[in-house]
């Protein structure tokens, strides 16, 4: 996970369990990809965090997870259609799945940026998911929703092909979602 900070971002280090993290373990990475190499290395996924912050001013916090259901759905390398209106929380009428690339590579970052066009979350093929928000709480809540959506989708397709909401209905939902937290 990471948080936008000054001219870069703070990110969890590579190879340190979250339960053992200390403040001094957190790594600052500038938006040009520089970090203090005498300290902890940033997460191997720092590139896509950097590129998300650089390409989207609405991203102030990012959560990346290998959550069970999102990872299972991502293994099919398909977008999740609008089988449920909550798909709109990710920012569109489907939940995109970024094409597969090896973890930690620029290719993976490019694929994620492509999948996140007009979105706040996406699946990462054969990998997991990424979500962003105004703060860590929002990013984490969205990541939880993505996990829930994927769990529900797995259950829905076990029964058969789910009914997909129309584009016009999703347009209505997307407008409602924009104003949902505003009152």
Range-by-range predicted roles:
Residues 1-183:
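Glycine-rich flexible loops
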């Amino acid at each position: 996970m990471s948080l936008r900070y000054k001219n870069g971002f703070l990110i969890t280090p590579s190879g340190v369990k979250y339960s053992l993290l200390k403040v001094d373990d957190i790594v600052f990475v500038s938006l040009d990809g520089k970090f203090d190499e005498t300290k902890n290395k940033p997460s191997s996924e720092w590139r896509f965090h950097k590129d998300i912050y650089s390409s989207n001013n609405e991203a102030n916090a990012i959560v990346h997870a290998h959550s069970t259901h999102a990872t299972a759905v991502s293994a099919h390398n398909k977008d999740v259609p609008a089988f449920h209106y909550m798909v709109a929380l990710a920012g569109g009428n489907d939940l995109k799945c970024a094409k597969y690339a090896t973890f930690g590579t620029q290719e993976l970052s490019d694929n994620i940026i492509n999948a996140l066009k007009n979105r706040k979350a996406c699946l990462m093929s054969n990998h997991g998911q990424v979500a962003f928000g105004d703060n860590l709480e929002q990013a984490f809540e969205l990541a939880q929703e993505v996990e829930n959506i994927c769990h529900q989708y797995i259950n829905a397709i076990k029964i058969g092909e789910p009914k997909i909401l129309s584009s016009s209905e999703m347009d209505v939902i997307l407008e409602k979602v924009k104003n949902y937290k505003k009152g």
